[in-house]
Amino acid sequence: MQPYQRDFIRFAIDRGVLRFGEFTLKSGRTSPYFFNAGLFNTGSALAELGRCYAAAIVDSKIPFDVLFGPAYKGIPLAATTAVALADQHQLDVPWCFNRKEAKDHGEGGSLVGAPLAGDVLIIDDVITAGTAIREVMQIINAQQAKAAGVLIALNREERGNGELSAIQEVERDFGIPVVSIVSLTQVLEFLADDPQLKQHLPAVEAYRAQYGI
């Protein structure tokens, strides 16, 4: 585990973004942990989150020309990551986002920011069913651009209804890598090393044995 990954898990736990207990997911599964990136909701939290995304981008070595944040949740993520890439890594990267509804006046159309062109790195919080990414792929294709990959905060490493996870389905269907700041593997590693949180390890391991990929 890289230092930025350990920092991210500790930060997510401290912010209440990553919690342990008993949670019913939209899928109907009862999960021993829950991840809610919406709670990175202050200036300092967003700044730290951007630094973690930026570190993951540099670590991934995925070549790209522009960062794209899908509306709505991806917009602040793309913005803070672009700032962190410039501040921490001296990489001045263009970024853009889409509107949910196209405007017909002012800065018209459905895209805002830098031109969506070349190799596009999509940035979002999680991939649950892959539906949002499929919509993004249509936007990118409509601009004659090309997806370089997807970056998310957490990979749950969990099967969907079939044998594959939603992330594996995206990788298979579009032939692009999906990388994450951390995956469940690293969360388990963190729990094993933390005396206070170790009590949650058996439940998370059991859940992984049942639903993991």
Curated annotation (Swiss-Prot):
Keywords: Glycosyltransferase, Magnesium, Pyrimidine biosynthesis, Transferase. GO terms for molecular function: magnesium ion binding; orotate phosphoribosyltransferase activity. CDD domains: PRTases_typeI. Homodimer. It comes from the Bacteria. It is an enzyme of class 2 (transferase). Its EC number is 2.4.2.10. Gene3D superfamilies: 3.40.50.2020. GO terms for biological process: 'de novo' pyrimidine nucleobase biosynthetic process; 'de novo' UMP biosynthetic process; pyrimidine ribonucleoside biosynthetic process. PANTHER family: OROTATE PHOSPHORIBOSYLTRANSFERASE 1-RELATED (PTHR46683:SF1). It comes from Pseudomonas putida (strain ATCC 47054 / DSM 6125 / CFBP 8728 / NCIMB 11950 / KT2440). 5-phospho-alpha-D-ribose 1-diphosphate binds at residues 26, 72-73, 99-100, 103, 105, 124-132. Orotate binds at F34, F35, T128, R156. Catalyzes the transfer of a ribosyl phosphate group from 5-phosphoribose 1-diphosphate to orotate, leading to the formation of orotidine monophosphate (OMP). Belongs to the purine/pyrimidine phosphoribosyltransferase family. PyrE subfamily. Pathway: Pyrimidine metabolism; UMP biosynthesis via de novo pathway; UMP from orotate: step 1/2. This is Orotate phosphoribosyltransferase. Its cofactor is Mg(2+). It catalyses: orotidine 5'-phosphate + diphosphate = orotate + 5-phospho-alpha-D-ribose 1-diphosphate. One of its GO terms (cellular component) is cytoplasm. The lineage of its organism: Bacteria, Pseudomonadati, Pseudomonadota, Gammaproteobacteria, Pseudomonadales.
